[in-house]
Regions:
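Solvent-exposed residues in well-ordered beta-strands and their adjoining turns
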Residues: 156-158, 224, 237-239, 480-482
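Short, acidic/hydrophobic/Gly-rich beta-strand patch recurrent on exposed beta strands
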Residues: 168-171, 237, 372
Length: 482
């Protein structure tokens, strides 16, 4: 299926955001470390339909024959010698790192306005100004370049000469590893832990995994750091369970930072590029690490979905919660709920305002549901929150068939968006409000047309810059029953 005109415009504008085409149109003048801050194997369940979160990257089947095309802009041919990142050209991750933050936001705003032009014209509204890190587009004054906002960091490992263990990032377009002494967009201290893991593996002669020959043991490491807490969790991904000097290695990893509360081992012996396998065990410390969002506490297990940029996550969630306009006695359905973060934050916010609601969370991954139930208990919401391990589409179809009551529906689907069946059932349920958080505005734009055709009007759509210096934008849409 060919791209729509709006999709082509959005893709072109996103590429301009990263390559700096607007810079070329304008004047050529340009004006602690924080201590790097956790249980069961990731559940596996087959759904009858696509449309529910499967993994941390929200990968899922798409409902359309045309796959989603994420535009990957080419890296700049030259790197500013004053660049804050010494490997920017080789890495290619932060393609707009050297571009003024205000211009990054302006380009993303243009892309979203072009993408949603037909919807906004249909509803007589405009796209809200993009919410950046610490600033909203249009604010007066300076727009400081965001740094240290990624609270999850990862590295692949590869064998080097004479038993060396190489770590860092894959060079752009290849699987060659580029060493990374420090990454300016990761929370300070995270990269030192990852590099330290490589050094300990070398010392104990634990061989890195060779993906071409499918030999070796150490494949990846993932570090997650708390934002409101100082807790750190490390997940070591190995090709098999048994390692030489295993206990010494695990203890050495735990000693790399005093705030490490959990070290987990994930076993992934399958070929391919997927980081995580299906078996996870705790080899040091607690089963989970803990963090906070919007005043709620969350236990995070090694394979749980949890946003990488918690500062912007709070903003994203608050926009959705405000759009829900929860009333006394409302039933809130949180579809694709993961570990329950959005629904629990909304329920807690209502509770703090003296508003009693009932929360129903739906997530296909049983491990995510286990986390959500534990998090409901952590936040004193066990009497008003229920979580089901089920496919979101199946669940909402059953609810519609049984004419069940849902007053507010929260949707946060994977990159492929929702399914036609889910959206049709959502309209049949007739919730008063729908909030739709999207990590892929292209598929969200498609889905919103179906919701509007099903009896809803679009009240507002707000872009959020979750990942500065990249072409990625997330959006929150608020809809109301006509």
């Amino acid at each position: 299926m060919a791209e729509s005109r709006a999709e082509r415009k959005a893709r072109r504008a996103l590429i301009e955001a990263a390559e700096g085409s607007e810079d070329r149109k304008s004047s050529k003048k340009s004006k602690s470390p924080q201590d790097a801050k956790g249980k069961s194997a990731k559940g596996k369940a087959k759904a009858k339909r696509p449309g529910s979160r499967r993994n941390e990257d929200k990968a899922s089947q798409t409902r359309s024959k045309r796959p989603y095309k994420n535009p990957v802009p080419s890296a700049r041919k030259a790197v500013d010698p004053k660049s804050p990142c010494s490997i920017m050209k080789a890495c290619g991750g932060c393609t707009a790192l050297n571009r003024p933050y205000k211009k990054q936001l302006a380009a993303k705003q243009t892309a979203m306005e072009e993408l949603f032009a037909a919807l906004c014209g249909r509803e007589g509204i405009s796209v809200d100004p993009i919410r950046g890190m610490g600033v909203t587009l249009g604010d007066p004054g300076k727009y400081p370049a965001p740094r240290g906002f990624r609270h999850k960091a990862a590295t692949p490992f590869a064998p080097g000469k004479e038993g060396a263990v190489r770590c860092g990032f894959f060079e752009r377009g290849t699987h060659r590893i580029v060493a990374v002494p420090e990454c300016p967009v990761e929370t300070p201290g995270a990269r030192q832990i990852l590099n330290g893991i490589a050094r300990e593996a070398e010392r104990l002669r634990i061989p890195a995994f060779n993906e071409d020959k499918h030999l070796g043991l150490l494949r990846y490491a993932v570090v997650r750091c708390g934002w409101r807490t100082d807790q750190v969790m490390v997940t070591l991904v190995t090709a098999q369970r048994d390692l030489p000097h295993a206990q010494e290695f695990f203890e050495a990893v735990a000693a790399l930072n005093p705030h490490i509360v959990t070290v987990a081992q994930n076993i992934n012996g399958r070929p391919g590029n997927a980081i995580l396998g299906e078996e996870t065990r705790i080899v040091y410390g607690a089963e989970c690490m803990r963090d906070q969002l919007l005043g709620c506490e969350f236990d995070i297990s090694p394979t749980a979905f949890y946003q990488t940029n918690p500062q912007q996550t709070e903003l994203l969630y608050q926009l959705a919660i405000d759009g829900m306009d929860l009333q006394q006695g409302d039933v809130l359905m949180d579809a694709y709920c993961g570990s329950g973060t959005i629904g629990l934050c909304a329920a807690k916010d209502a509770q703090n305002k003296g508003i009693g609601i009932m929360l129903l969370g739906v997530e296909r991954n049983p491990a995510g549901i286990a986390d959500a139930r534990r998090n409901a208990e952590l936040n004193g919401l066990t009497r008003s929150a229920w979580f089901m391990a089920d496919d979101a589409t199946d669940c909402i179809l059953d609810a519609a068939d049984n004419n069940e009551r849902v007053d507010v529906l929260s949707i946060d689907p994977p990159r492929a968006g929702s399914t036609p069946e889910f959206l049709e059932a959502a309209c049949a349920l007739k919730p008063r409000r729908i909030t739709y958080i999207s990590c892929n505005p292209v598929t969200q734009e498609r889905d919103l047309h179906q919701l509007l055709d099903g009896g809803y009007r679009l009240l507002k759509i707000t872009p959020v810059d979750m990942f500065p210096h990249t072409d990625h934008t997330e959006t929150v849409a608020v809809l109301e029953r006509r």
